[in-house]
């Protein structure tokens, strides 16, 4: 991926990148191939919606958007259909041309209780991932469980900070009380 993961896919090519809920394991090389194939279906700078679940499909979609320079709005796959239609009408995914620096939009309720989008650049994502990885001493021996949704900033930062260091992600939507 042009902004930070390409060399990681090669450097850790034989290491396990992802373990899915169903037990499926992917190496960094395999994940990189899936991401490249999906990225080829996107147009640079054209907005995409990712209806997120903590699964392989959503992870590949997110990474492919970054690879293709296609800004992505990360949304809860279980969002109310009426709200999703409203967001589609406003933002027109697949049609809207975005600024070249825009990488990801995350929803926040803000102070009004209605969804707002926070815009993040590639530099924002990279510096956040590297800062977290450095502070927590994350390396290729770490394994992170995706307990938080990837459409949350904290959930996404866990993904980015672990992938950038060649660690393993354990993808799950399960919650434990």
Summary of predicted features, one role per range:
Residues 11-43, 81-88, 96-97, 120-123:
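Conserved AMP-binding/adenylate-forming core of the ANL superfamily
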Residues 39-78, 147:
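Conserved AMP-binding/adenylate-forming
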Residues 1-16, 97-103:
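A short N-terminal helical cap/helix-turn-helix that marks the beginning
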Residues 65, 108-111, 144, 150:
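Conserved S/T- and glycine-rich ATP-binding loop of Class I adenylate-forming
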Residues 5-7, 56-74, 133-134, 153-165:
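Hydrophobic alpha-helical segments in the ANL/AMP-binding
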Residues 126-143, 153-177:
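Conserved AMP-binding/adenylation subdomain of ANL enzymes
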Residues 34, 52-53, 73-87, 167-177:
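ATP-dependent adenylate-forming carboxylate-activation enzymes
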Residues 27, 103-130:
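Conserved AMP-binding A3 loop
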